[in-house]
Amino acid sequence: MAAAVPVPQFRPVTPLIFDLDGLILNTEDLYTDVFEEICNRYGKKYNWDVKSLVMGKKALETAQTIVEFLNLPISKEELLKESQEKLQMVLHTAGFMPGAEELIHHLKKHRLPFALATSSETVTFQTKTSRHTGFFGLFHHIVLGDDPEVKNGKPGMDIFLTCAKRFSPPPDPKDCLVFEDSPNGVEAAIHCGMQVVMVPHENLSADLTRKATLVLSSLHDFKPELFGLPAFTE
């Protein structure tokens, strides 16, 4: 008789916190297209070396990192303005990432508390979610990058700690489970003492996924029972 495969033991959790870009909505490829176009104009390549640094950051921090890393001959403000103008024209087309809808509806069915914590600022968030307002109405609350309490972007802890304390009742941060696709987001969650499930882009270096509690190729692969949550049923 074959030996049973050991099941990983993770801490049971109650509230769940989700990132948005590249995890719930497929926006990362849209960002890549825009920044590639701008950087190519200056003879620079927007590749995964720089992309992995900016994933999860606030918009101005992203622009600053790209300008400095690639030594672009424009200011961070100029890059931000042009990229935002181009993004506003395409972000409304973003669809769901695999498994996102099913997982959120499963959590809602079982009346589990879950929220969204995204570095996106208000106007950008509204554009991204304009075709999915009913879906995002399922979340207990949403914390955005321009929230007054979010002083420091990821990998700073502000956004996840702010999001956690807005549950009712507020949980101990260690009882939260975060879902992320970016190294910056994973680092922020770990600094908060939270467990974090990472669903990285296939092109992201495996070295940048090692800090995550659990790494999955898709939200379809998430097994809630590993964290003490109700399992999916056929």
UniProtKB/Swiss-Prot annotation:
Mg(2+) binds at residues 19, 21. One of its GO terms (biological process) is nucleotide metabolic process. Its EC number is 3.1.3.96. The active site is at residues 19, 21. GO terms for molecular function: metal ion binding; pseudouridine 5'-phosphatase activity. It holds the Pfam family HAD_2. Its cofactor is Mg(2+). InterPro entries: Gpp1/Gpp2-like, HAD-like_sf, HAD-SF_hydro_IA, HAD_2, HAD_sf, PGP-like_dom2. Keywords: Hydrolase, Magnesium, Metal-binding, Nucleotide metabolism. It catalyses: psi-UMP + H2O = pseudouridine + phosphate. Belongs to the HAD-like hydrolase superfamily. CbbY/CbbZ/Gph/YieH family. NCBIfam families: HAD-SF-IA-v3. Dephosphorylates pseudouridine 5'-phosphate, a potential intermediate in rRNA degradation. Pseudouridine is then excreted intact in urine. PANTHER family: 2-DEOXYGLUCOSE-6-PHOSPHATE PHOSPHATASE 2, PSEUDOURIDINE-5'-PHOSPHATASE. This is Pseudouridine-5'-phosphatase. The lineage of its organism: Eukaryota, Metazoa, Chordata, Craniata, Vertebrata. The gene is Pudp.
